[in-house]
Amino acid sequence: MACTREDVIEYISNLSVLELSELVKEFEEKFGVSAQPTVVAGAVAAGGAEGGAAAEEKTEFDVVLTDAGPKKINTIKVIRQVTGLGLKEAKEAAENTPTVIKEGVSKEEAEELKKQFEEAGAKVEIK
């Protein structure tokens, strides 16, 4: 029996963040593509001075765990606390760095998350 597009979307919508991340990596490897957004040079040049102002007005940030640090258990606890992931998923996220912990958060929330992770001994980037 063939899967329909709706079946695929339903399956993907039921995946955890970690499972979805692994699926994306498999797609990248199998099809030789990248999930990273591409920048079009013409669009940047056409933006001119407005592009610089837009960069300053960034309101959504991603919190990326780059290193779980020597106290991995503390880092796993923080991951579980801020994401609601289960123990297994949080452990995998801590071991498979870099890992996006939260996406599209405010600067204040991103700074607070960074502080929590650094207190646990982890290294975090805000992008």
From Swiss-Prot:
Keyword annotations from UniProtKB, A to Z: Ribonucleoprotein, Ribosomal protein
Record SUPFAM superfamilies: ClpS-like, Ribosomal protein L7/12, oligomerisation (N-terminal) domain
Record keyword rRNA processing present: no
GO cellular component, one term: cytosolic large ribosomal subunit
InterPro entries (UniProt xref): Ribosomal_bL12 (IPR000206), Ribosomal_bL12_C (IPR013823), Ribosomal_bL12_C/ClpS-like (IPR014719), Ribosomal_bL12_oligo (IPR008932), Ribosomal_bL12_oligo_N_sf (IPR036235)
GO process terms (BP): translation
Function according to Swiss-Prot or TrEMBL: Forms part of the ribosomal stalk which helps the ribosome interact with GTP-bound translation factors. Is thus essential for accurate translation.
Family: Belongs to the bacterial ribosomal protein bL12 family.
Protein name: Large ribosomal subunit protein bL12
Organism for this UniProt entry: Nitratiruptor sp. (strain SB155-2)
Taxonomic lineage of the native organism: Bacteria, Pseudomonadati, Campylobacterota, Epsilonproteobacteria, Nautiliales
